[in-house]
Amino acid sequence: MVRTEQNWENSFHFFWRFIHNPLKIGALRPSSAQLCRATVKAIEPEKCRCVVELGPGTGVITQYLLNSIDPQSRFLAVEIDPVFHENLQKRFPGTAIHRGDAEDLGKWLQPQKSGLADAVVSGLPWTLFTESQCRSILAEIASCMQPDGIFVTLCY
């Protein structure tokens, strides 16, 4: 992989956020290009009308997702970290990026109005959550997905 200024900047910001908030940020650096490609392939983007990303961090996977789904498809991201959220809004203007908790996904997706997600990609730090939090988040995800929807989660 060729290191670019953007890659270095993403890695630096990610590591800096981890140092400042290790109980919320679950990785030391952003996902690799290989992981991004595998994640996108797993959700079958050509079939998706609605894609959700939870915990997008610096937006590395977000970029791959947005480049792969149909421009008419709906995309929604939820990021809890205020610095990541602000940077994501600047990097992806006009994209639905909400600041908050994954347990509130339905509030932003509003599946009763705009349909359920065909795919949910999660970069959430599951090992930092209690069992109760994991169950609550997974229940919220399930309630917002199509019955045949695809759920992909990344663990580090």
Positions of predicted regions on the chain:
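A short glycine-rich, Lys/Arg-flanked "PGG" loop and its adjoining helix->strand segment in the class I
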Residues: 135-147
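Conserved SAM/SAH-binding beta-strand->alpha-helix loop
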Residues: 81
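A short SAM/SAH-binding and catalytic strip from SAM-dependent methyltransferases
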Residues: 118-132
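Class I SAM-dependent methyltransferase Rossmann-like catalytic core
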Residues: 7, 11-46
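S-adenosyl-L-methionine
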Residues: 85-111
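Conserved class I S-adenosyl-L-methionine
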Residues: 48-57
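Conserved SAM-binding loop of SAM-dependent methyltransferases across substrates and taxa
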Residues: 58-70
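Conserved beta-strand signature within the Rossmann-like core of class I S-adenosyl-L-methionine
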Residues: 148-155
